[in-house]
UniProtKB/Swiss-Prot annotation:
This is Protein RecA. Keywords: ATP-binding, Cytoplasm, DNA damage, DNA recombination, DNA repair, DNA-binding, Nucleotide-binding, SOS response. Can catalyze the hydrolysis of ATP in the presence of single-stranded DNA, the ATP-dependent uptake of single-stranded DNA by duplex DNA, and the ATP-dependent hybridization of homologous single-stranded DNAs. It interacts with LexA causing its activation and leading to its autocatalytic cleavage. Coiled coil: none annotated. GO terms for biological process: DNA recombination; DNA repair; SOS response. NCBIfam families: tigrfam_recA (TIGR02012). The gene is recA. ATP binds at G74, P75, E76, S77, S78, G79, K80, T81. GO terms for cellular component: cytosol.
Length: 359
């Protein structure tokens, strides 16, 4: 027998053995428990916009991926909850159901409404313990009817033993174990339900760190591993109208991304009582892509003079929504073409990524 014939016989036997194993698995666990990917070709991943054009582009797929776990972390008053509420507003615009697990008991419904959230349809829970919060999340995800769930925040998911104990008692690692156990159960059901689970997290300073970044996030290491997206949001500078501070310029770094190239960043304005300024992004990205010409402090769009100074240009676009919409469509078309470019919104890959602290 030739060598080629012998090799074909071996391959045939291996294929028969594989088919038998697959058949046995399907009998034991049901059809769909195992499959070849060619039977289910890859499709474009569904996403929900973050409310920021630049951040949608930096994420690589046009927003936060459905069926995945996301972490948003940063210092106090950096815009974490604002960004999460914008995600809820965008999901509701698509007809989705959303839930907000308010572990901090600090949700401002008036502010949420100003950001575009339909608070009448928003499902809100203010749990007493971390266990209760995560059980509620599990029930909502398993229902298959929720598109976005926001947990605000990880630091406020206090274990029952800590709440029922005395103020000075030590409870090392309780919260980390609670999250680790919950995430092991939630990961698969979040994927099957095609739901976005967003955890908002705080940062702490690790004592005794001389070299490297002393900042750490709360809740242990499990969340870092189970998330598909991690967003580091920071306040860059204040936005002023004469002497009054009216908002913050904000930078978001995509420090982890399992669905597109990571280490990209986006900058946008968060205006008080308004949220993410889409008009500011249109001006900035219009200049970036060459649609808006900036000559000194003057901005123009073709023959149209937008105004002197960035704030005046934003004011003109606010008064002329047709021009703003036209510019936005052109920008989004350019982003769609270059979304997967390695240089678009790229940052240094050596960016310090926060470690996690076990509480």
């Amino acid at each position: 027998m030739s060598m080629s014939g012998s090799k074909k016989d071996v391959e045939s036997e291996k294929q028969k053995a594989l088919d038998a194993a697959i058949s046995q698995i399907e009998r034991a666990f049901g059809r769909g428990a195992i499959m070849k990917l060619k039977q289910h070709p890859a499709e474009k991943m569904d996403s929900v916009s973050t409310g920021s054009i630049a951040l949608d582009a930096a994420l690589g797929i046009g927003g936060l991926p459905k069926g995945r776990i996301v972490e948003i972390f940063g210092p106090e008053s950096s815009g974490k909850t604002t960004l999460a509420l914008h995600v809820i507003a965008e999901a509701q615009k698509q007809g989705g159901n959303c839930a907000f697990i308010d572990a901090e008991h600090a949700l401002d419904t008036v502010y949420a409404r100003k950001l575009g959230v339909n608070v009448g349809d928003l499902i809100v829970s203010q749990p007493d313990t971390g266990e209760q919060a995560l059980h509620i999340v599990e029930y909502l995800v398993c229902s298959g009817a929720i598109d976005v769930i926001v947990v605000d925040s990880v630091a406020a998911l206090t274990p029952r033993a800590e709440i029922e104990g005395d103020m000075g008692d030590q409870h090392m690692g309780l919260q980390a174990r609670l999250l680790s156990h919950a995430l092991r159960k939630l990961t698969s059901v979040v994927s099957k339900a095609n739901c976005i689970l967003v955890f908002i997290n705080q940062i702490r300073i690790k004592i005794g760190v001389i070299y490297g970044n002393p900042e750490v996030t709360t809740g242990g290491s499990a969340l870092k591993f189970y998330t598909s997206i991690r967003l580091d949001i920071r306040k860059v500078s204040a936005i002023k109208d004469k002497d009054n501070v009216i908002g913050n310029q904000t930078r978001v770094k995509v420090v982890k991304n399992k669905v597109a190239p990571p280490f990209k960043q986006a900058e946008f304005d968060i205006v008080y009582n308004e949220g993410i300024s889409k008009l500011g992004e249109i001006v900035d990205m219009g200049v970036k892509f060459g649609f808006v010409e900036k000559s000194g402090a003057h901005y123009s769009y073709g023959a149209v003079k937008l105004g002197q100074g960035r704030e005046n240009a934003k004011g003109y676009l606010k008064s002329n929504p047709d021009i703003a919409n036209e510019l936005e469509q052109k920008i989004r078309a350019c982003l769609a073409e270059s979304m997967h470019s390695s240089d678009l919104f790229a940052v240094d890959e050596r960016t310090d990524v926060l470690e996690e602290e076990v509480f």
